[in-house]
Amino acid sequence: MGQKVNPHGLRVGVINDWDSRWYAEADFADNLVEDYNIRTYLKKKLYSAGVAKIEIERASDKLKVIIHTAKPGVVIGKGGAEIEKLKVEITQYTTKKLNLEIKEIKKPDVCAQLVAESIAAQLENRISFRRAMKSTMSRTMRSGAKGIKTAVSGRLGGADMARTEFYSEGTIPLQTLRADIDYGFAEADTTFGKLGVKAWIYHGEVLPTKGNKKEGSDK
Protein backbone atom coordinates (compact mmCIF):
# COMPACT_ATOMS: atom_id res chain seq x y z
CA MET A 1 0.00 0.00 0.00
CA GLY A 2 2.99 2.31 0.26
CA GLN A 3 2.74 2.91 -3.49
CA LYS A 4 -0.98 3.75 -3.47
CA VAL A 5 -1.38 6.16 -0.56
CA ASN A 6 -0.30 9.81 -0.36
CA PRO A 7 3.19 9.70 1.27
CA HIS A 8 2.46 12.78 3.36
CA GLY A 9 -0.84 11.46 4.75
CA LEU A 10 0.73 8.09 5.57
CA ARG A 11 3.36 9.81 7.76
CA VAL A 12 1.14 12.31 9.59
CA GLY A 13 1.65 11.77 13.31
CA VAL A 14 4.89 9.86 12.69
CA ILE A 15 7.31 12.38 11.16
CA ASN A 16 4.89 14.87 9.52
CA ASP A 17 2.42 17.33 11.01
CA TRP A 18 -1.04 18.34 9.77
CA ASP A 19 -1.33 21.21 7.26
CA SER A 20 -4.45 22.39 9.12
CA ARG A 21 -4.07 22.66 12.89
CA TRP A 22 -7.29 23.35 14.79
CA TYR A 23 -10.07 21.62 16.72
CA ALA A 24 -13.81 22.16 16.34
CA GLU A 25 -17.03 20.31 17.08
CA ALA A 26 -20.11 22.18 15.86
CA ASP A 27 -18.17 24.34 13.37
CA PHE A 28 -16.07 21.54 11.88
CA ALA A 29 -17.78 21.51 8.45
CA ASP A 30 -17.71 25.32 8.15
CA ASN A 31 -14.01 25.45 9.05
CA LEU A 32 -13.19 22.67 6.59
CA VAL A 33 -14.93 24.48 3.71
CA GLU A 34 -13.26 27.73 4.76
CA ASP A 35 -9.82 26.08 4.67
CA TYR A 36 -10.53 24.59 1.24
CA ASN A 37 -11.70 27.92 -0.20
CA ILE A 38 -8.69 29.81 1.18
CA ARG A 39 -6.22 27.23 -0.16
CA THR A 40 -7.89 27.09 -3.59
CA TYR A 41 -7.94 30.88 -3.89
CA LEU A 42 -4.31 31.36 -2.79
CA LYS A 43 -3.01 28.56 -5.02
CA LYS A 44 -4.72 30.09 -8.05
CA LYS A 45 -3.79 33.69 -7.20
CA LEU A 46 -0.14 32.95 -6.37
CA TYR A 47 0.58 30.23 -8.94
CA SER A 48 3.50 32.20 -10.42
CA ALA A 49 5.04 32.64 -6.94
CA GLY A 50 5.81 28.92 -6.55
CA VAL A 51 3.59 28.13 -3.55
CA ALA A 52 4.42 24.66 -2.24
CA LYS A 53 2.30 24.46 0.90
CA ILE A 54 -0.33 26.48 2.78
CA GLU A 55 -0.71 25.84 6.52
CA ILE A 56 -3.72 27.06 8.50
CA GLU A 57 -3.93 27.46 12.29
CA ARG A 58 -7.00 28.51 14.27
CA ALA A 59 -7.43 29.71 17.84
CA SER A 60 -10.82 31.07 19.00
CA ASP A 61 -11.43 34.14 16.77
CA LYS A 62 -7.96 34.17 15.17
CA LEU A 63 -6.84 32.64 11.87
CA LYS A 64 -3.18 32.22 10.91
CA VAL A 65 -2.26 31.37 7.30
CA ILE A 66 1.35 30.34 6.59
CA ILE A 67 2.36 30.42 2.91
CA HIS A 68 5.50 28.48 1.92
CA THR A 69 6.78 30.03 -1.32
CA ALA A 70 9.91 30.01 -3.47
CA LYS A 71 9.39 33.69 -4.40
CA PRO A 72 8.42 35.64 -1.27
CA GLY A 73 9.06 38.95 -3.06
CA VAL A 74 6.21 38.23 -5.50
CA VAL A 75 3.81 37.50 -2.62
CA ILE A 76 4.83 40.49 -0.47
CA GLY A 77 5.17 43.01 -3.31
CA LYS A 78 6.82 46.42 -3.28
CA GLY A 79 6.57 47.88 0.21
CA GLY A 80 4.20 45.08 1.25
CA ALA A 81 1.47 46.25 -1.15
CA GLU A 82 0.61 42.79 -2.50
CA ILE A 83 0.37 41.11 0.89
CA GLU A 84 -2.04 43.81 2.10
CA LYS A 85 -4.22 43.16 -0.96
CA LEU A 86 -4.13 39.44 -0.17
CA LYS A 87 -5.31 40.05 3.39
CA VAL A 88 -8.29 42.06 2.14
CA GLU A 89 -9.19 39.41 -0.45
CA ILE A 90 -8.92 36.51 2.03
CA THR A 91 -11.36 38.24 4.42
CA GLN A 92 -14.17 37.43 1.95
CA TYR A 93 -13.78 33.78 3.02
CA THR A 94 -13.56 34.34 6.78
CA THR A 95 -14.75 36.72 9.49
CA LYS A 96 -11.90 35.93 11.87
CA LYS A 97 -8.89 38.10 12.64
CA LEU A 98 -6.33 37.20 9.98
CA ASN A 99 -2.57 36.84 10.40
CA LEU A 100 -0.66 36.15 7.17
CA GLU A 101 2.88 34.75 7.40
CA ILE A 102 5.27 34.15 4.49
CA LYS A 103 8.02 31.51 4.67
CA GLU A 104 10.68 31.23 1.98
CA ILE A 105 11.61 27.86 0.47
CA LYS A 106 15.41 27.95 0.33
CA LYS A 107 15.81 25.01 -2.08
CA PRO A 108 12.89 24.89 -4.55
CA ASP A 109 14.65 22.17 -6.58
CA VAL A 110 14.12 19.64 -3.76
CA CYS A 111 10.47 20.56 -3.10
CA ALA A 112 8.22 17.92 -4.71
CA GLN A 113 5.27 20.25 -5.35
CA LEU A 114 7.45 22.82 -7.11
CA VAL A 115 9.24 20.08 -9.08
CA ALA A 116 5.88 18.72 -10.30
CA GLU A 117 4.73 22.23 -11.26
CA SER A 118 8.02 22.84 -13.08
CA ILE A 119 7.55 19.69 -15.19
CA ALA A 120 3.92 20.66 -15.88
CA ALA A 121 4.98 24.14 -17.03
CA GLN A 122 7.53 22.62 -19.42
CA LEU A 123 4.89 20.27 -20.84
CA GLU A 124 2.60 23.25 -21.47
CA ASN A 125 5.48 24.86 -23.39
CA ARG A 126 5.56 21.77 -25.66
CA ILE A 127 8.85 20.41 -24.34
CA SER A 128 9.18 16.61 -24.68
CA PHE A 129 7.96 14.87 -21.52
CA ARG A 130 11.11 12.69 -21.35
CA ARG A 131 13.39 15.71 -21.61
CA ALA A 132 11.34 17.67 -19.04
CA MET A 133 11.36 14.79 -16.54
CA LYS A 134 15.03 13.85 -16.90
CA SER A 135 16.40 17.41 -16.79
CA THR A 136 14.31 18.26 -13.71
CA MET A 137 15.31 15.03 -11.95
CA SER A 138 19.03 15.55 -12.55
CA ARG A 139 18.74 19.11 -11.19
CA THR A 140 16.98 17.79 -8.07
CA MET A 141 19.66 15.15 -7.46
CA ARG A 142 22.41 17.77 -7.84
CA SER A 143 20.62 19.88 -5.21
CA GLY A 144 21.09 17.19 -2.55
CA ALA A 145 18.08 14.85 -2.80
CA LYS A 146 18.75 11.17 -2.04
CA GLY A 147 16.17 9.94 -4.54
CA ILE A 148 13.43 11.12 -6.88
CA LYS A 149 10.63 9.46 -8.84
CA THR A 150 8.41 11.24 -11.36
CA ALA A 151 5.33 10.11 -13.26
CA VAL A 152 3.47 11.73 -16.15
CA SER A 153 0.04 10.42 -17.22
CA GLY A 154 -2.17 11.22 -20.19
CA ARG A 155 -1.91 11.46 -23.96
CA LEU A 156 1.87 11.69 -24.00
CA GLY A 157 3.26 13.13 -27.22
CA GLY A 158 -0.27 13.36 -28.61
CA ALA A 159 -0.76 9.57 -28.64
CA ASP A 160 -4.32 8.30 -29.17
CA MET A 161 -4.16 6.10 -26.08
CA ALA A 162 -3.32 7.55 -22.67
CA ARG A 163 -0.49 5.95 -20.69
CA THR A 164 1.79 6.59 -17.71
CA GLU A 165 5.57 6.98 -17.86
CA PHE A 166 7.75 6.65 -14.73
CA TYR A 167 11.37 7.70 -14.24
CA SER A 168 13.43 7.44 -11.06
CA GLU A 169 16.91 8.11 -9.70
CA GLY A 170 18.34 7.12 -6.33
CA THR A 171 16.16 5.39 -3.72
CA ILE A 172 12.49 5.99 -2.83
CA PRO A 173 11.54 3.82 0.23
CA LEU A 174 7.77 4.50 0.10
CA GLN A 175 6.82 1.98 2.79
CA THR A 176 9.41 3.11 5.37
CA LEU A 177 7.52 5.45 7.71
CA ARG A 178 10.67 7.12 9.04
CA ALA A 179 11.71 7.99 5.47
CA ASP A 180 11.17 11.71 4.80
CA ILE A 181 9.43 11.60 1.41
CA ASP A 182 7.97 14.75 -0.12
CA TYR A 183 5.11 14.38 -2.62
CA GLY A 184 3.72 16.79 -5.19
CA PHE A 185 1.05 16.77 -7.89
CA ALA A 186 0.36 19.17 -10.76
CA GLU A 187 -1.64 19.26 -13.98
CA ALA A 188 -0.57 20.49 -17.41
CA ASP A 189 -3.12 21.79 -19.93
CA THR A 190 -1.89 20.82 -23.40
CA THR A 191 -3.48 20.83 -26.87
CA PHE A 192 -4.12 17.09 -26.46
CA GLY A 193 -5.83 17.42 -23.08
CA LYS A 194 -4.71 17.36 -19.45
CA LEU A 195 -1.55 15.61 -18.30
CA GLY A 196 -1.07 14.63 -14.65
CA VAL A 197 2.39 15.03 -13.10
CA LYS A 198 3.49 13.41 -9.82
CA ALA A 199 6.81 13.75 -8.01
CA TRP A 200 8.26 11.89 -5.01
CA ILE A 201 11.50 13.17 -3.43
CA TYR A 202 13.43 11.31 -0.70
CA HIS A 203 15.35 13.53 1.75
CA GLY A 204 16.70 10.87 4.12
CA GLU A 205 15.50 9.24 7.34
CA VAL A 206 13.94 11.06 10.28
CA LEU A 207 13.90 9.32 13.67
CA PRO A 208 10.51 10.03 15.32
CA THR A 209 11.62 10.64 18.92
CA LYS A 210 9.86 12.90 21.43
CA GLY A 211 12.73 15.35 21.74
CA ASN A 212 13.50 15.43 18.03
CA LYS A 213 10.85 17.18 15.95
CA LYS A 214 11.06 17.65 12.21
CA GLU A 215 11.94 21.14 11.00
CA GLY A 216 8.79 23.11 10.24
CA SER A 217 6.63 21.06 12.61
CA ASP A 218 4.80 22.85 15.43
CA LYS A 219 4.46 19.69 17.55
Curated annotation (Swiss-Prot):
Domain (KH type-2): residue spans on this chain: 38-106
Superkingdom, natural source: Bacteria
UniProt-listed InterPro entries: KH_dom, KH_dom-like_a/b, KH_dom_type_2, KH_sf_prok-type, Ribosomal_S3_C_sf, Ribosomal_uS3_bac-typ, Ribosomal_uS3_C, Ribosomal_uS3_CS
Annotated Gene3D superfamilies: 3.30.300.20, Ribosomal protein S3, C-terminal domain (3.30.1140.32)
Single GO molecular function: structural constituent of ribosome
Keywords noted in UniProt: Ribonucleoprotein, Ribosomal protein, RNA-binding, rRNA-binding
One GO location term (cellular component): cytosolic small ribosomal subunit
Gene Ontology biological process: translation
Its job: Binds the lower part of the 30S subunit head. Binds mRNA in the 70S ribosome, positioning it for translation.
Subunit structure as annotated in this protein's UniProt entry: Part of the 30S ribosomal subunit. Forms a tight complex with proteins S10 and S14.
HAMAP family in UniProt: Ribosomal_uS3_B
Family named by the database record: Belongs to the universal ribosomal protein uS3 family.
Protein name, UniProt field: Small ribosomal subunit protein uS3
Native source species: Lachnoclostridium phytofermentans (strain ATCC 700394 / DSM 18823 / ISDg)
Lineage: Bacteria, Bacillati, Bacillota, Clostridia, Lachnospirales
